[in-house]
From Swiss-Prot:
Entry GO terms, CC: cytosol
Name of this chain's protein: Glutamate 5-kinase
Pfam families from the UniProt entry: AA_kinase, PUA
Compartmental location: Cytoplasm
Binding residue positions for substrate: 56, 144, 156
GO biological process, one term: L-proline biosynthetic process
Gene Ontology MF term list: ATP binding; glutamate 5-kinase activity; RNA binding
Similarity-based family: Belongs to the glutamate 5-kinase family.
Keyword Transferase included in the entry's annotation: yes
InterPro entries per record: AceGlu_kinase-like_sf, Asp/Glu/Uridylate_kinase, G5K_ProB, Glu/AcGlu_kinase, Glu_5kinase, Glu_5kinase/COase_Synthase, Glutamate_5-kinase_CS, PUA
Gene name in the database record: proB
Length: 376
């Protein structure tokens, strides 16, 4: 309890994420939950903490608003339309709840493309920090009305984690309908025990979250583990908290042993490398020989064309690509200095041969080490 209390006492900026499962009920938006959430965030604000809220619920709210009865899986156009209906209803509920405590809120809707462009990524940071300076609580959601499947964040757990790193927040709290991370499936095994502290996200910890077909499903426990890894790389603390527990945020900040806390790593990844590793979606893959893998993993070197034995995918200069061993295992991700057609032409060659093949040589490296993130 003492360790938890110390972590929360030091926290200045906090990201809180709430999902559809606890935001909605059979009657639509769970207004009493939002009222309680506003009260708790007001308490944190009064205690000197800055709070950013990441809120799901637009599609679910829209579905309830127009009494959508079709039980079939929603298509993209239905999701987008329901999000458009539900988002305004959701924000109105937040405005009323926070207004009771004389707090202002601001809506921010993001797509993955907003974070993929470095300038827009930094502009989002500046906007949110300015809102906090104004004393306004940002309420952020994925813009489901315009997002397409291949450019989605995947879930708001990921969005919350990315924002935690972007804003250099100290803590990311994911409030969920599950009490904590368990060592076994608690709905199937009565001996399952909650893990209250995780010091390292090992393969064993990831296995405890199940797979995408488990009871947790997409946006469930597995996505929260992925989010915790992102927060971990940025030097922050991640929390999985029981969203339906009374006064959950106040109890967490009091150091109470509820939920699961993922302790931060000691070394924070640089901001640009966090962006490369977690925000950008790789457009292709480079297969590397053993020598190149060793140079990257042990020598901290840049990737030269001589170590590349194969490529896949189509990409342009400046795009993100995976760097893999010959067996396909990924060791790094980075920004390429050459388009795929040029990399294919110079793979296996010495850097001094680039100019004779491409008729120019802007860079000796295919990926400079400053734009390379080692993953294993």
């Amino acid at each position: 309890m003492q360790l938890r209390r110390e972590i929360f006492d030091k926290a200045r900026r906090v990201v809180v994420k709430v999902g559809s499962a606890i935001l909605t009920n059979v009657g639509g938006i769970h207004t009493s939950f939002i009222a309680d959430l506003a009260r708790e965030i007001s308490y944190l604000r009064q205690s000197g903490h800055e709070v950013i809220l990441v809120s799901s619920g637009a599609v679910a709210a829209g579905r309830k608003k127009i009494s959508w009865q079709d039980s079939a899986p929603l298509g993209m156009k239905e999701k987008q339309a329901l999000a458009a209906i539900g988002q305004s209803h959701l924000m109105r509920t937040y405005e009323e709840a926070f207004g009771f405590y004389e707090l202002d809120v601001a809506q921010i809707l993001l797509t993955h493309a907003d974070l993929s462009h470095r300038d827009r990524y930094l502009n989002i940071r500046n906007t949110i920090l300015t809102l906090l300076k104004f004393g306004v609580t940002p309420i952020i959601n994925e813009n489901d009305t315009v997002s397409v499947e291949e450019l989605k964040f995947g879930d708001n757990d990921t969005l919350a984690a990315l924002l935690t790193n972007l804003l250099e927040a100290d803590i990311c709290i994911c409030l969920t309908d599950v009490d904590a991370l368990y060592d076994k499936n608690p709905q199937k095994d009565p001996t399952a025990r909650p893990l209250h502290i995780v010091t390292k996200i090992s393969p064993e910890i990831e296995a405890m979250a199940g797979n995408s077909n488990s009871l947790f499903g997409t946006g469930g426990m597995q996505s929260k583990i992925r989010a915790a890894k992102i927060v971990f790389s940025g030097g922050g603390t991640a929390i999985i908290g029981p969203g339906r527990a009374p006064r959950v945020l106040q109890r967490l900040f009091a150091g109470e042993d509820i939920g699961t806390i993922f302790l931060p790593c000691k070394e924070r990844m640089k901001s640009k490398k966090q962006w490369i590793a977690h925000v950008l979606k790789p457009k292709g893959t480079l297969l590397l020989d053993a020598g190149a893998c060793k140079a990257l993993l042990q020598g901290g070197k840049s990737l030269l064309p001589s170590g590349i034995v194969g490529i896949s995918g189509e990409f342009d200069r400046g795009d993100s690509v995976n760097c893999c061993r010959l067996d396909g295992s990924r060791i790094a991700v980075g920004l390429v200095n050459y388009a795929s057609v040029d990399v294919n032409a110079i793979k296996g060659l010495q850097s001094r041969e680039i100019a004779s093949v491409l008729k120019c040589c802007d860079n000796e490296e295919v990926i400079h080490r400053d734009n390379l993130v080692i993953l294993s």
